[in-house]
Amino acid sequence: YRSALTKLAAPRIKKNRCIWLYCDSSKTVKDNAYYQFIHDCKKNDGIERYYICNKDADITGWFDDSQRAQLIEYGSVKHRLYALSADKILTSFYGLQDFLCYPNGAYKYFADLTTFELIYLQHGVLHAHLPTMYSLDRMAIDKEVVSTRFEVDNLITNYCFEDSFLIKSRMPRLKHIPKDKKPEKKILFAPSWRKFLVESDGKGGWIPKNAAFINSEFYKNVMAFL
């Protein structure tokens, strides 16, 4: 029944409409999709833009009244149907559960309805050497937004990208960096997470493995450094 309903409803939603969805993971964090959405909402180009938002996320002060009307709850029926009807999905996370709310394995029954172009917005400027994660052949994306010449050269040279896959528009979030704050002589030490110290919750999130973390060489080396 659900499959039949979706196959009937999705084409009706898509008819004579251009729909773009913006997603910042299934949990909703203020990342590049949020800033891209705020930037793009100012355009009057006939495109319907919607930001996918988790109902449990604290979004106080994020949106004005007009933007709030363009929010879609993650996992809702509307999200499921609009995901199938979208022309573009712009996401700062490229995991399937981060922008599509279909359970693992279920999406294949609806994939024939989709024609969306998946635009990866990244989180920032890629500087680490991670081709096993971010090479074009490892990611199910159509285009990637870049902000610097370094990224263009790096992705083409080390990540199997061709120039045609890169959108050189730069991240709108860079315009939100406060310019009135004076530089401070401080050093931020922020070790990145380690995949082997967490496990997936099956919904796009992660569950920490506390015992493994405490006993890991990663933890011991960080503490020794501090």
Question: For the regions a protein language model found, what residue spans apply to each?
Answer:
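Non-catalytic membrane-proximal stalk/linker segments that position and tether the catalytic domains
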Residues: 1-19
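Active-site and donor-binding regions of nucleotide-sugar-utilizing enzymes
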Residues: 18-177
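Generic detector of well-ordered alpha-helical segments enriched in charged/polar residues
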Residues: 2-6, 60-61, 220-223
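Conserved catalytic-core segment of nucleotide-activated headgroup transferases in glycan assembly
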Residues: 30-44, 172-226
